[in-house]
Amino acid sequence: MPYQLENRPPDLRESMYFPEIIRGIGTITKHFLKNLFFSRDANPDILARKRGGFGHSDNVTLQYPEERAPYAPAYRGLHRLVPREDGKPRCVACYMCATICPAQCIYIEAAEYPDDPVEKYPAKFVIDELRCIVCGFCVEACPKDAIRMDSGEHTPPSYERSAQIWDEKRLLRGPPVSYQYDPWLRRGSPSIPPDKLEEMRARAKPFPTVATDEASQTPGFSVRALAAEAKDRAQAARK
């Protein structure tokens, strides 16, 4: 049964808003004092590089982008295609990554090797990093471990949307073997002989703690270099 609502006028306490204002100021002051005197950063890499705190604080300020906080080993960064030792991509253009992608940001065109008509390769492999939701489904669905998100780099800034369209040439930058936490190196693979697997494990390098332009987490993979490259392409397109 419908009933009529009665809108009563606010009383003096509600109309002045003073209690809520005081409560908000108290919350801000509490967190301010807590962060100023008693906070502890749980990241040991950050604590090791602290600049010296005020009171008992271990808060630090990193001079970004020259200094960057380290990413966790499980961080999902920019995509990269894993090359074989001969430089060809591991990808066999099975379309599993493009099919499972919820954002539909992967586009593949398949082609056949002239000397091996059984196996295919991606004649075109494009990822729109702006549409990507960084879910990692493409990495899990790939049967050949051909695509990874272990670059340790986030999407570089750019002035043009076209600079975030990554093709197979840019995606193939990076070493064929990843880092020591690579699950393929830990569990092995039927397609890799045991002696070859041990050699790959011996060559794997530890995941770096801090990414800089001088020591990037992936050789030849620099955020500043990619941003400069995108800017040069945009300037060339305007001419």
UniProtKB/Swiss-Prot annotation:
Subcellular localization(s) per the UniProt record: Cell inner membrane
Requisite cofactors: [4Fe-4S] cluster
Principal EC category: translocase
Catalytic activity: a quinone + NADH + 5 H(+)(in) = a quinol + NAD(+) + 4 H(+)(out)
Keywords: 4Fe-4S, Cell inner membrane, Cell membrane, Iron, Iron-sulfur, Membrane, Metal-binding, NAD, Quinone, Repeat, Translocase, Ubiquinone
E.C. numbers: 7.1.1.-
Pfam families xrefs: Fer4
Gene Ontology MF annotations: 4 iron, 4 sulfur cluster binding; iron ion binding; NADH:ubiquinone reductase (non-electrogenic) activity; quinone binding
Binding site for [4Fe-4S] cluster 1: C91, C94, C97, C142
Topological category with respect to the lipid bilayer: Peripheral membrane protein
InterPro entries: 4Fe4S_Fe-S-bd, 4Fe4S_Fe_S_CS, NADH_quinone_OxRdtase_chainI
Binding site for [4Fe-4S] cluster 2: C101, C132, C135, C138
Principal cellular location given in the protein's record: membrane
Domain 4Fe-4S ferredoxin-type: 81-111, 123-152
GO cellular component: plasma membrane
Cofactor note: Binds 2 [4Fe-4S] clusters per subunit.
Disulfide bonds: none
Subunit-structure text: NDH-1 is composed of 14 different subunits. Subunits NuoA, H, J, K, L, M, N constitute the membrane sector of the complex.
Function of the molecule: NDH-1 shuttles electrons from NADH, via FMN and iron-sulfur (Fe-S) centers, to quinones in the respiratory chain. The immediate electron acceptor for the enzyme in this species is believed to be ubiquinone. Couples the redox reaction to proton translocation (for every two electrons transferred, four hydrogen ions are translocated across the cytoplasmic membrane), and thus conserves the redox energy in a proton gradient.
Membership in a protein family: Belongs to the complex I 23 kDa subunit family.
Protein name: NADH-quinone oxidoreductase subunit I 1
Organism field: Anaeromyxobacter dehalogenans (strain 2CP-C)
